[in-house]
Structures are given as C-alpha cells and as structure tokens.
C-alpha cells in the first residue's frame, strides 16, 4: 500500500456552500491558484450542472490549473456527468466525481428506491463517466450510516465498473473515530477487488471530530483525505485540511504516511481563503489561528525561551508564518517593496505593482512604518479590485455628532460621468450608503457588515466586508483604509461593481445563447 496520502480539496465546492454570497469566477480562480501553489493533489472546484456561472468558473479553472488535478461534482444523473465533462475537457487531465446515497434511510426516504437499484444506477453512471476520463471517483453518500456489508457490495460493484477512487463520506458528521476506522478496515476485509482503487474519506464536523475521523481512517488504510481549508463547509463545516496535513507531518512517527503538500504555503493559503470567503479565522483555531503559537503563561514563556520544543510541537515557520518586520517607510522605493513581497512568497502575477506601490505610499504617509500584514492586506485588496470599475469613489464627506443623525456627501464616478448626492442616515456609514444608493439607483439590502483590524495599534488598517442582497442574489464587497468610514464606502463601491459586472456577464451569456439559437435557425 502506498504511503502517500492524497489531499483532495473541496473548498470551492463543499466549502463554498457555507458562504452567504457566492464567489465570482475570478475569486474562485484566485483560491484555486493558491491551492495549486500549496500543492493539493486534487481540487474539486464546482458542480457545473447547477448554473451557467458555476460551469464557467469550473471551465476557467480547468483551463488554468496545471499542477493539480481538477475535479467537478456530478450526481448519478446522465446530464450531470455530461455537463461536468463538457466543463472539464479543456484540462489536460481531469476527474469526474459522481455520487449516490447508500444508507437505508436515504434509499428509502430520499431516493424511494432499493439497494439493488442504487448499485445498478451507480455502475451505469460510472461507466458513462469513464467514456470521458479514466479518473472517476465514486462516493457512497451517507456511508457512515450504511451497514458495512451493504457498503461492501456497492464498493465492489463501483470498482468493477471502473471507479479508481472510492470515497467513504461521513456525510452528517455522525460517526466516532473508532467506528469510522472500523468501516475502513471492514471494507478491506470484505471487498476482494479493493486493491484496484484508492479509498478516500470525506468527513463533516457536526460533532467536532471531522479531523479525528479522517486521521483514524488514514491509520486504517484510507489514502485520500477530502476537506476544505479552514474547515469551511455546510453546517459545522468540513475536515480542516491544514490540521490533517500538519498532524500527519508532526506525528509521522505513528502515522507512517506523508503528503506532497508544501506546508510552508499553509498560512498564506488559509489567509487567502479567509479573506476572499469573508470568514474570519477564530483566534484559537488549530494551526492557523492568531493564537496558535502564542504563549501567555509565564511558565510557558520561560520554557519556550529556553527551548522552543518545550511547548511548541511545530514552528510558525513550518506553515509559512514568519516574524513581522518593520522595515518599510514612505522613503522605501519600488524595488524594496517588490523585494519584501518576494520574501513573503508573492510572485509578480499575484498583484499589480503600480497599484500596490501607489497604495503603499498613501498608507506609509499616514502610518510612517508599513508592516508585512499591511502589505499583504493591500495586495489582497489590489487583487480583488483590479478589474475595470464602472463605479469609483471620487470624494466623500461626513458630518456627525452626538445625535443619531449623520449627513454624508458623496461623489461617485459612474463610467465617464461624475455624480453627487447627499443623504442622512443613522450614523456615518448608513449616511454614506444612503447617498451611494441614491446615486446608483441600485436596490440593495445590507445583510452583513464585518470590521476587522489588519495590524496593530491605533493606525491599523480597517478591513470592512459586507454582503448585500440585490434582487434575490447576494454579493460580497471589501474595503480597506485606516479610516473605518472610508473602508465602508469602498466596500459598498466594490459591491456595486460586482453587481454591475454580474449583470454584464448575464447579458453576454444571453447574447451567446441568442447567437446559438440564431445559428440553429440558419442551419
């Protein structure tokens, strides 16, 4: 049996289901590139049949990613499999992941079928997927609540049909680690052709043991772990990949397996996912939380100073978290900024140097010293907002005092035209938003507002993340500045640009569909 554990990332599929607003194709690609840099073996990037937007993003990622295998999800439905293959075919090689429920409860109440019919359907769909690729993964949905003998029948038939990877999910996060290990061991005992496939696991965290279940399964013989960065996902989330990866690395003495992950990219990838998905990482989160390497106890601090291994089982550097440096000021040139970005692991393609340096100089004039975390925040915002903007914040002014009412004046560039409006609101942020909405005429409802400090001290950058509802769809925006009101205004303008771009994409899709229809009529 191979000693490599394949890392299968589903941040962009299962993980995205936890978000209040769907990611754009560009945001998904940004995360996919970070995952590729970290070295994930397989990335599941969407469910193409679900929407034209998901199809487009899967296709874009499949065309771009070269060093990780790109995968798409499909139910055991002919159309699902055909559409997934259509989206993925631009890749040099790809995986189709198809699934059907196998537990008695799901078969009886959801599928209204029988186990024999489920097996027959699974076999047919696996063979259909094999017409497009020899890399087919099959999942037994709700395997954790499927009797092992029934599960063994399904797995044996799926392998005979051509599935190269068999995934055993604990779909509802119900199974205990010793039970889950027993399921994997039971399959190895019961399935005669199990050596012809890789056994995978996909665990959920409803009882807080997703990582424990995955590690127990690996110890029992599973050689692929599925999960998401930071553990994001439906309900209580997925197995946190960074925790599994580092557990395997730190406890290689008893796990006796390894991954091909570049663990020095873990922290940056985690931050990228957190920022783009607008899901802050808890301070006490294992591996990537801000307190993961903090020592407040005097006894612990003394022990760490004498020997870090007294209280640290791994180092911050092992996940790519280096010490903060205070070496950039308004007198630092472009070369110094570029060099520092390279030291932090960024490539030229990760940011626009002209835009980044302009933002750096403005911030350095305000703060004096610019920290690494400032640069990273600027680079992230730079990447998020580098697309052409229809709306641009030209000027704003706010008057407020001890009363509840605030007044804001805003000038907004709308294409080539500058428009101005004033409005009152319950506080400066509300007043700004009322004025912006008057200018654009967009009917948006604010459903989430988050403010996070990026850095330390009174002059730290403030990042505002908002989610708005617009005609039944949710859109995310982000703004960054040392002034909270300015951050809030920038976040709303970012949202409006995302809404505008979505409308333009919809128009383009409709145009293509109409052209296709016209061509049919011509033929």
From Swiss-Prot:
Pathway: Amino-acid biosynthesis; L-leucine biosynthesis; L-leucine from 3-methyl-2-oxobutanoate: step 1/4. GO terms for cellular component: cytosol. Residues 392-523 are annotated as: Regulatory domain. Homodimer. It catalyses: 3-methyl-2-oxobutanoate + acetyl-CoA + H2O = (2S)-2-isopropylmalate + CoA + H(+). Its main location: cytoplasm. This is 2-isopropylmalate synthase. Belongs to the alpha-IPM synthase/homocitrate synthase family. LeuA type 1 subfamily. Catalyzes the condensation of the acetyl group of acetyl-CoA with 3-methyl-2-oxobutanoate (2-ketoisovalerate) to form 3-carboxy-3-hydroxy-4-methylpentanoate (2-isopropylmalate). Its EC number is 2.3.3.13. The lineage of its organism: Bacteria, Pseudomonadati, Pseudomonadota, Gammaproteobacteria, Enterobacterales. Mn(2+) binds at residues 14, 202, 204, 238. Its cofactor is Mn(2+). One of its GO terms (biological process) is L-leucine biosynthetic process. Keywords: Amino-acid biosynthesis, Branched-chain amino acid biosynthesis, Cytoplasm, Leucine biosynthesis, Manganese, Metal-binding, Transferase. Residues 5-267 form the Pyruvate carboxyltransferase domain. The keyword Transmembrane helix does not apply. It is found in: Cytoplasm.
């Amino acid at each position: 049996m191979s000693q490599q554990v394949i890392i299968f990332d589903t941040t962009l599929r299962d993980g995205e289901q936890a978000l209040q607003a769907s990611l754009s194709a560009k945001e998904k690609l940004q995360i996919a590139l970070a995952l590729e840099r970290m070295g994930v073996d397989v990335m599941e990037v969407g469910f193409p049949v679900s929407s034209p937007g998901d199809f487009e993003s899967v296709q874009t990622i499949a065309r771009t990613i070269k060093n990780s295998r790109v995968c798409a999800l499909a139910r055991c439905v002919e159309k699902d499999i055909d559409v997934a293959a259509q989206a993925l075919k631009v890749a040099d090689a790809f995986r189709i992941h198809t699934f059907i429920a196998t537990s008695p409860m799901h078969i009886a109440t959801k599928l209204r079928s029988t186990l024999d019919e489920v097996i027959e359907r699974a076999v047919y769909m696996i063979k259909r997927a094999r017409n497009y690729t020899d890399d087919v993964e099959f999942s037994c949905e709700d395997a954790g609540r499927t009797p092992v003998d029934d599960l063994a029948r399904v797995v044996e038939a799926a392998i005979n049909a051509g599935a190269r990877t068999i995934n055993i999910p604990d779909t509802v996060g119900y199974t205990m680690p010793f039970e889950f290990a027993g399921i994997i061991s039971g399959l190895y005992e019961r399935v005669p052709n199990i050596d012809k496939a890789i056994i995978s696991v996909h665990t959920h965290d409803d009882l807080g043991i997703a990582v424990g279940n995955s590690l127990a399964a690996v110890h029992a013989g599973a050689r692929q772990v599925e999960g998401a960065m930071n553990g994001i996902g439906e309900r209580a989330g997925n197995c946190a990949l960074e925790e599994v990866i580092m557990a395997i690395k730190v406890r290689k003495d008893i796990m006796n397996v390894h991954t091909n992950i570049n663990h020095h990219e873990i922290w940056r990838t985690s931050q990228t996912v957190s920022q783009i998905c607008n899901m802050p990482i808890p301070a006490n989160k294992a591996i990537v939380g801000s307190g993961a390497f903090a020592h407040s106890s005097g006894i612990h601090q003394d022990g760490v100073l004498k020997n870090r291994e007294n209280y640290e089982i791994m180092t911050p550097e092992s996940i790519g978290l280096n010490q903060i440096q205070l070496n950039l000021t308004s007198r630092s040139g472009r070369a110094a900024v570029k060099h520092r970005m390279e030291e932090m692991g960024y490539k030229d393609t990760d940011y626009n140097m002209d835009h980044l340096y302009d933002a750096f100089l403005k911030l350095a004039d305000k703060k004096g010293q610019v920290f690494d975390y400032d640069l990273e925040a600027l680079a992230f915002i730079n990447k998020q907002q580098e697309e052409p903007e229809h709306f641009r914040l030209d000027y704003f002014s706010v008057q407020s005092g001890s009363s509840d009412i605030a007044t804001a004046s805003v000038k907004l560039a709308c294409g080539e035209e500058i428009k101005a409006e004033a409005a009152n609101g319950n506080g400066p942020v509300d007043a700004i938003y009322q004025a912006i909405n008057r200018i654009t005429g967009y009917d948006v409802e604010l459903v989430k507002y988050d403010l996070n400090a990026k850095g330390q001290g009174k002059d730290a950058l403030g990042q505002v993340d908002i989610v708005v509802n617009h005609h039944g769809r949710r859109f995310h925006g982000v703004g960054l500045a040392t002034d909270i009101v300015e951050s809030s205004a920038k976040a709303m303008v970012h949202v409006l640009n995302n809404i505008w771009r979505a409308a333009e994409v919809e128009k383009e899709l409709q145009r293509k569909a109409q052209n296709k229809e016209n061509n049919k009529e011509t033929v």
